[in-house]
Amino acid sequence: MVEKFVGTWKIADSHNFGEYLKAIGAPKELSDGGDATTPTLYISQKDGDKMTVKIENGPPTFLDTQVKFKLGEEFDEFPSDRRKGVKSVVNLVGEKLVYVQKWDGKETTYVREIKDGKLVVTLTMGDVVAVRSYRRATE
């Protein structure tokens, strides 16, 4: 089921991402340019339930990140937004990848799903919701 997420994805649209970054406590220099970032996502799968999500933002920057995980298993994460003590878990729920991060008594959720051939990521922190959509890159 996760196979449909595998591949290279380029940003197509971003809504409210800067506000989302503010809500999670990202530094001002990150949140101010949130919707202007143009990331490419590389999603790969190995041995069924092991995945890697790599995010590049054009020329190499401190915002670039890579996360390796096994579905359903909690892992320590070191996000590029500089939050500390983040524990994350990613689960396949129906046809969606649901990614939950917890730190300092807070929680945020990323839901990745395929809609009309696009990868749509809905990020939620409290009552702040951001939506970013990606188109599959042509090789």
From Swiss-Prot:
Pfam families: Lipocalin. Gene3D superfamilies: 2.40.128.20. GO terms for cellular component: cytoplasm. It comes from the Eukaryota. Changing N57Q: Reduces fluorescence emission. The keyword Hydrolase does not apply. Becomes fluorescent upon binding free, unconjugated bilirubin, a heme metabolite. Can be used as diagnostic tool to detect abnormally high levels of free bilirubin, which are indicative of impaired liver function. Could also be used in research as fluorescent marker in eukaryotic cells and animals. One of its GO terms (biological process) is bioluminescence. It is found in: Cytoplasm. InterPro entries: Calycin, Fatty_acid-bd, ILBP, Lipocln_cytosolic_FA-bd_dom. (4Z,15Z)-bilirubin IXalpha binds at N57, T61, S80, R112, R132, S133, Y134. Detected in small-diameter muscle fibers from the white muscle layer from juvenile animals (glass eels) (at protein level). Detected in small-diameter muscle fibers from juvenile animals (glass eels). Keywords: Cytoplasm, Luminescence, Photoprotein. GO terms for molecular function: lipid binding. Changing N57A: Abolishes fluorescence emission. Monomer. Forms a beta-barrel structure that accommodates bilirubin in its interior. Belongs to the calycin superfamily. Fatty-acid binding protein (FABP) family. This is Bilirubin-inducible fluorescent protein UnaG. It comes from Anguilla japonica (Japanese eel).
